[in-house]
């Protein structure tokens, strides 16, 4: 076998695969060609149909254009009328003249059917003929007033009239408002003393005063009853000597002694009765009349009912403190004041009066020698003795050597100095409560103190009330009558007023005419026609 034959055998083995691929490709191309041809035919048919419809529409439009509007309207109306007539005939009840039934039916005729529904409303009919003219109506109402005319020209001024008679004085005008405050006038004369003021309230309780000086010794008291002998007290400590005793009776004038010390001031005497009031002084001379004030304004201002406040001027500056006044007269006895606050505890008072003698106790044992008793009462005046030094020595010798019987208790001496507190004694029986003493007289008024320092400026006071209206001033002189003024221009026409209230209904008019009256050129009946 040669090489050519092998090549031919190899080519025959590969042909079946290549043939299948070419056949599939050819079939696909054929399907696409058939689809495209069908689509072209479908589009051509649709385009032909659309073209025919457009041609028909154009032809119909041309026919309508050539037929004109009246023919088209008549054709449209004819079709609608036929349709409406057909609907109307269908709604009308149909009467059967001959019974439409087969010959073999022997049934009686049935009842007539019910009435049908009303048909549609028909088209409006043609307008009727115009009637004859009516009778003329009654007279109309008055027309509205016309617009105001233009302003007239200015008239010529009239002649001056005769001079009028002198008029009477007019009524005095109302009081004018208060004028400005005038200058401060000279100080007036001293006025009369005013009436005595009412009793003032009781003043506050004064502070306790300083201890006064020792007063003079009082008169000797009555002889006291002998007291109960007390227990022996402890020996006291040496203290300052006591105050001198009361002076004895006046003796014979002795030799001129040295000058004594100044005496103690006495207790102030009682307040004297108030004096009679003095006689009123004579009235001073009348001052010169002031200058005539200016004419006040006649405008009345109410000031909200506070005229007194309106007349008051603004408060002036604070004045300097005045000189101290004269001490006033003593007032009447005031009412007893309220009980004051309890004061501080005072110093220990003097020893009280001796109590009543108790029952006699058993005789005690002889005690030791007691203290020397108080000096006895003054004896009768003796004769003029010898010199004071010798008499004093003999008196002392008698007292020491020959002790006499104890004399009656003398008057209580002045309070001694504060001694050392002794042991606490036994409480005595409680005495009865004494009656309250009478109220002492009021002391004399003290001297007037020096004027105090100027106080701080006070706060601004409230607004004063308006003052009362002043008295009517004297009417001024009547002025001369002025010249007659020229006639003023004519005023403009006023604005028309509002529409008035509707009037009552008028009475019925006369009966109308049986036949028409001729009408004049103004549209109204000829005068005299309706009187016939």
From Swiss-Prot:
Keywords: Cell membrane, Collagen, Membrane, Repeat, Signal-anchor, Transmembrane, Transmembrane helix
Naturally occurring in which organism (per UniProt): Mus musculus (Mouse)
Main localization category: membrane
Biased composition, class Basic and acidic residues, residue ranges: 342-354, 380-393, 427-441, 478-495
Pro residues compositional bias, start-end: 174-184, 314-326, 403-414
Superkingdom, taxonomy of origin: Eukaryota
Residue intervals annotated with topology Cytoplasmic: 1-23
Pfam family, one: Collagen
Segments passing through the bilayer: 24-45
Protein name from the UniProt record: Collagen alpha-1(XXIII) chain
Residues annotated as domain Collagen-like: 108-166, 173-232, 240-298, 313-372, 404-452, 455-514
Record PTM: Undergoes proteolytic cleavage by furin protease to yield a 60 kDa soluble form that forms a homotrimer and exhibits a low affinity interaction with heparin.
Comp. bias regions, Low complexity: 129-145, 196-207
């Amino acid at each position: 076998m040669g090489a050519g034959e092998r090549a031919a055998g190899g080519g025959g083995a590969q042909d079946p695969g290549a043939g299948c691929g070419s056949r599939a490709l050819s079939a696909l191309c054929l399907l696409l060609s058939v689809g495209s041809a069908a689509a072209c035919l479908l589009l051509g048919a649709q385009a032909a149909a659309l073209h025919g419809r457009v041609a028909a529409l154009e032809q119909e439009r041309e026919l309508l254009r050539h037929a004109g509007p009246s023919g088209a309207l008549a054709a449209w109306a004819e079709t609608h009328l036929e349709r409406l007539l057909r609907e109307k005939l269908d709604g009308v009840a149909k009467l059967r003249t001959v019974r439409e039934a087969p010959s073999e039916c022997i049934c009686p005729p049935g009842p007539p059917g019910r009435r049908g529904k009303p048909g549609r409303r028909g088209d409006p009919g043609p307008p009727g003929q115009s009637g004859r003219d009516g009778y003329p109506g009654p007279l109309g109402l008055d027309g509205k007033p016309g617009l105001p005319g233009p302003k007239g020209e200015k008239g010529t001024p009239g002649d001056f009239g005769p001079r009028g008679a002198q008029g009477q004085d007019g009524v005095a005008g109302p009081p004018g408002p208060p004028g400005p405050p005038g200058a401060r006038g000279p100080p007036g004369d001293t006025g009369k003393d005013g009436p005595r003021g009412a009793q003032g309230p009781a003043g506050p309780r004064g502070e306790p005063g300083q201890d006064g000086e020792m007063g003079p010794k009082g008169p000797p008291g009555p002889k006291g009853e002998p007291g109960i002998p007390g227990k022996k007290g402890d020996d006291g400590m040496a203290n300052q000597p006591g105050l001198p005793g009361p002076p004895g009776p006046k003796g014979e004038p002795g030799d001129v002694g040295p000058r004594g010390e100044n005496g103690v001031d006495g207790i102030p005497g009682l307040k004297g009765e108030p004096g009679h009031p003095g006689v009123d002084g004579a009235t001073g001379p009348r001052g010169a009349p002031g200058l005539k004030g200016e004419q006040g304004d006649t405008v009345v201002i109410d000031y909200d009912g506070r005229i007194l406040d309106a007349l008051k001027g603004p408060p002036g500056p604070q004045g300097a403190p005045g000189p101290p006044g004269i001490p006033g007269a003593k007032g009447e006895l005031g009412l007893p004041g309220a009980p004051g606050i309890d004061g501080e505890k005072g110093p220990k008072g003097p020893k009280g009066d001796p109590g009543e003698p108790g029952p006699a106790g058993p005789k005690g044992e002889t005690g030791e020698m007691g203290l020397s008793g108080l000096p006895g009462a003054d004896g009768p005046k003796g004769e003029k003795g010898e010199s004071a030094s010798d008499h004093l020595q003999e008196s002392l010798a008698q007292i020491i050597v020959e002790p006499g019987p104890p004399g009656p208790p003398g008057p209580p001496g002045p309070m001694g100095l504060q001694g050392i507190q002794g042991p606490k004694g036994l409480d005595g029986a409680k005495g009865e409560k004494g009656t309250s003493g009478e109220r002492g007289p009021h002391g004399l008024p003290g001297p007037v103190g020096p004027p105090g320092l100027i106080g701080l400026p006070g706060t601004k006071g409230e607004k004063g009330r308006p003052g009362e209206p002043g008295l009517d001033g004297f009417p001024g002189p009547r002025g001369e009558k002025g010249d007659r003024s020229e006639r003023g221009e004519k005023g403009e026409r006023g604005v028309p007023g509002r529409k008035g209230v509707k009037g009552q209904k008028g009475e019925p008019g006369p009966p109308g005419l049986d036949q028409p009256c001729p009408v004049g050129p103004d549209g109204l009946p000829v005068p005299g026609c309706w009187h016939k």
